[in-house]
């Protein structure tokens, strides 16, 4: 699995909320067997900053989405004055015993 954390700092709360809404609008498309996104978390750090964590089934799914969507999306945010930073790497997952792991396909 591959974990990707994206930090986005924007000019105002409206811009941040708009980015989050745009990403949520493509969630159902990415949360499929063919697209490989397993989990996405939004952490509202402040009115103008959001950190997002994405968990991908493997690197090939993440690269496919980056090629088709993400690179242009983040470039557009930067051109509008936002600051985007990204870190990624192999990811090891632990789950709480409160989660029924038999329902989770990883």
Model segments located where?
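Short S/T/G/P-rich N-terminal loop/turn motif that feeds into the first structured element of a domain
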Residues: 1-50, 55-71, 78-106
């Amino acid at each position: 699995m591959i974990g990707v954390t994206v930090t986005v700092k924007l000019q105002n709360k409206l811009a941040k909320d708009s980015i989050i809404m745009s990403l949520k609008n493509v969630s159902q498309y990415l949360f499929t067997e063919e697209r490989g996104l397993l989990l996405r978390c939004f952490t509202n750090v402040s009115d103008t900053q959001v950190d997002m964590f994405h968990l991908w089934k493997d690197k090939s799914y993440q690269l496919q989405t980056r090629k088709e969507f993400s690179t242009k999306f983040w470039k557009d945010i930067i051109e509008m004055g936002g600051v985007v930073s990204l870190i990624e790497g192999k990811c090891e997952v632990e789950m709480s015993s409160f989660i029924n792991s038999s329902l989770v396909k990883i």
